[in-house]
Amino acid sequence: MKKYFVVSLVKNGILGGGIVADQEAITYHTGKVTVPREYRQLVMKYDEISDATEGWLFILPTVLVKMKNGKEYKFVVFFSRKRLINTISAHGFHP
């Protein structure tokens, strides 16, 4: 079953979009044409995630997703940050 999260990617500003979580990966997507192509449909497979931690950007709740290849993606999560962490944990990664 897919789960949906309202998020913004923090990369050279705050880029609105959403995350869809399914059985294989979490996928950030946005329809904004000003966002570089590599971030418009960003697939993060659970087995490639090395860490996921909660944090803050000023007053906004965030989740930092670290990949095994060294890349990091910070997301402002507007609702249910804990549910996003739990979704990642349920698929193999445990913070």
Which sequence ranges carry the predicted segments?
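Glycine-rich, low-complexity intrinsically disordered segments
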Residues: F93-H94
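Generic signature of intrinsically disordered, low-complexity segments enriched in small/polar residues
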Residues: V7-S8, G31, I49, V76-K82
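Anionic N-terminal interaction surfaces
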Residues: M1-E24, Q41-L42, R83-A90
